[in-house]
Amino acid sequence: MIKVAPSILSADFAKLGREVGEVAAAGADYLHFDVMDGLFVPNISIGIPVLKSLRRATDMFIDVHLMIDRPVRYAEQFCKAGADMVTFHVEADSQENILKAIGIARGLGKKAGVVIKPNTPAEAVLPFLPMVE
C-alpha cells in the first residue's frame, strides 16, 4: 500500500497549523519532519520546539527524520515531543549508538527506522533491520 508523507520543511512556519490542516484534508497519511543540524548535513532546519507545537496542532502520524550528528543524544526528546516514528541515519554514529537510539524510541512506544545517504551502500542497514519497522 502506498502512503503519502509530505515534508513540512517547505511549509510557511507562520501558518504551520493551517498548512498541516490543508495537508491532512488533502489526504496525506503522515507528516514527514526533517531535522538537520548543520553538522551531519550542511543545512539547519527545525527541532524539538517546533515538533511540540506541531503535535498540539494535529493528531496525524509524524515521522521524524533525524539528519543529525549522534542522534542517540536526542532520541528520547524527539519521542517525548510528539514523534510517532523516528528514523536514524546509520552513518550518523556508531552501530552501538544507533541501536541504542532505536531501543530508546521503541522503549517509549514509538516506531523506529533507519535511513542512509545516497552514496551509502544499501547493505549498511542490514544489522538494524531486525529492530526497525
Please report, for each region that a protein language model flagged, where it lies by residue.
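Conserved N-terminal beta1-alpha1 strand-loop-helix module at the mouth
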Residues: M1-T87, A92-K100, I104-A112, V125-V132
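Short gly/ser/thr-rich secondary-structure transition/capping motifs
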Residues: V115-N119
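Membrane-interface helix caps and helix-loop-helix hairpins in membrane proteins
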Residues: T120-A124
